[in-house]
Amino acid sequence: MTKKIQILCTLGPSSLNKKFLNFTNNKVSLLRLNMSHVKSKKLKHHINFIKKNTSTPICIDTEGAQIRTKINKKKKFKINQIFKIHKLNGKIMLYPPDVFNKLKINDALDIGFNDLTAKIISKNKKYLSLKTTSSGTLENNKGVHIKNRLIKLNYLTKKDFEAIKVAKKFKIKNFALSFTNTVEDIKKFNKILPKQNKIFKIESKQAVKNVGKFFKLANNFLIDRGDLSKSINIENIPVAQRKIIKISKKHRGKNVFIATNFLETMIDNQTPTRAEANDIYNSLEMGAKGLVLAAETAIGKFPDKAVIFLRKMIKIYKNNKKI
């Protein structure tokens, strides 16, 4: 990967169109397809469409070792309300399916971002009974974090393996491993993708602890501040971000990218806040080699303007550095 500061854009309903894809030429470094939100049967179509409308490279971002909700219809809950999560064929389930067997009574679940928290109060072979510990909304495909303990999951899902197989046929050269937790995760990913560019995502307390070891095995890392905040608490994100970048500087040729909430305001508004501008500048000043736009370009109303503002901030940072 090049030494220039990179911009990674997540594609979604707002940006998977000819106009935005054409706009990204010479402005964006990578276009991210998030397999947590891309249907397997649509992947070939998306890759073909992207390649026809832009020369910007594609990055396949795996689902990785994360638990997600599977429900037919979103539902609102009050505090202390009881609900069930079924193992199979229920209105509310979890993905990947094998996680059901790993959950225990008293496990505390944090679902989505500021959406809902609940505790498992009973379990049988068919379903879990949970009691909400906050009010909130339960929606489909939301990340689920187990607050009280670490659950070992496969580093890639079946869907991930299928996506990698498809991507290889299209000669995609860039891949990201979500929830890189251990040295073994990196070794396994390197083995199945030996020649491709790989980005390893730091999204858990375990990953932060192991980051020093990670830098000996790979070159490109991404701090996902959203999922990481579920594991180490949001107030510790600035500390973790600085720690990881500081460690990266002790190793030659290491790149740290940062994601989540850089321009959250621009999902609905044409201009960012002063705090967002400051966050971007501070991240660059710390030594971030790349910045990631997620919801801003995937579902935001102004994906092109978000990219333009990020480019402005990078230019200002570079110019100020020369003063």
Q: What residues fall within each predicted segment?
A:
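Non-catalytic helical/linker scaffolds that mediate oligomerization, partner binding
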Residues: 1-323
